[in-house]
């Protein structure tokens, strides 16, 4: 015999509250290492977000290294990007950005079916991009595999025949773009002299001196400060040498590291590009 409908109703609907687990609605505590040790197993560092970094430094009496005013601190603080040659991540400002553009044939018309990878000076969101190490010698040694430098999204949707990298002009094109930018900026930028505390001195010394050097000099009332010295004689570029050496009094050009950030960044990239690894 089956149970009457009233019995079903009593069992399913009118169940006494004393048999219900009151803690069933509570969330089970996360104990899985996939959650508790996410940063460890995923190889990702835990990120800390602050609305006001300066307020945090003052509130908790933390040491302030003033990296905002440090040339090299700004370079190292740039976003991390995966690099195509070493397959490692590095600061974006220490890499060569590459952009994907339509390939142009002999008739100077773009071929929609072919894509070309070219070096550029600055990252742009309007192009699909990737990055390689900012070193002429390393790039030269790996140009044979340059088609693998295309972004992954392009490699997955294109055939090898449709991808092009001009290895004969790749290095010279990037070098020419850097020099053209630097020449244009140096020809109009004022020489701030040794008055600026946060400064970079450009010199032209063809002797065996390092391309980049940090010196401790006296400023004002004899207070010691550090200044970066960029030796453009390392580039063997007559036009740049003439611009830097035109001031016989200062024997170089002083740049303000706060106001001339873009120029200093490209000067650093140029010296880094030509440095011997």
Swiss-Prot record:
Question: Where does the protein end up?
Answer: Mitochondrion
The keyword Mitochondrion is assigned to this record: yes
UniProt keyword list: Mitochondrion
Q: Sorted alphabetically, which Pfam families does this protein's record hold?
A: RRG8
The main location class comes to mitochondrion
**What family does the database annotate?**
Belongs to the RRG8 family.
* Lineage top rank: taxon: Eukaryota
- What's a GO cellular component annotated to this UniProt protein? mitochondrion
Q: Name one GO biological process term.
A: mitochondrial genome maintenance
Q: What does this protein do?
A: Required for respiratory activity and maintenance and expression of the mitochondrial genome.
Q: What is this protein called?
A: Required for respiratory growth protein 8, mitochondrial
């Amino acid at each position: 015999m089956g149970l009457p409908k009233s019995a079903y109703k009593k069992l399913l609907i009118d169940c006494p509250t004393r048999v219900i687990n009151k803690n069933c609605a509570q969330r089970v505590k996360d104990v899985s290492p996939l959650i508790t040790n996410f940063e460890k197993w995923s190889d990702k560092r835990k990120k800390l977000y602050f609305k006001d970094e300066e307020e945090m430094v003052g509130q908790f009496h933390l040491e302030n290294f003033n990296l905002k005013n440090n040339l090299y601190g700004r370079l190292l603080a740039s976003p991390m990007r995966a690099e195509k040659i070493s397959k490692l991540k590095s600061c974006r400002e220490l890499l060569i950005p590459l952009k994907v553009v339509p390939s142009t044939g002999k008739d100077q018309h773009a071929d929609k079916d072919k894509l070309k990878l070219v070096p550029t000076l600055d990252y742009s969101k309007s192009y699909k991009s990737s990055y390689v190490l900012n070193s002429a010698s390393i790039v030269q040694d790996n140009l044979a595999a340059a088609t693998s430098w295309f972004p992954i999204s392009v490699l997955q949707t294109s055939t090898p025949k449709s991808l092009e990298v001009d290895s004969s002009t790749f290095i010279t094109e990037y070098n020419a773009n850097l020099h053209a930018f630097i020449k244009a900026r140096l020809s109009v930028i004022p020489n701030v002299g040794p008055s600026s505390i946060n400064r970079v001195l450009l010199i032209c010394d063809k002797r065996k001196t390092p391309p980049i050097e940090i010196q401790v000099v006296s400023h004002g009332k004899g207070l010691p400060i550090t200044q970066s010295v960029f030796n453009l004689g390392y580039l063997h570029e007559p036009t740049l040498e003439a611009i830097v050496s035109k001031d016989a009094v200062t024997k170089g050009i002083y740049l303000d590291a706060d106001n001339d950030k873009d120029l200093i960044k490209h000067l650093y990239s140029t010296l880094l590009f030509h440095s011997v690894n």
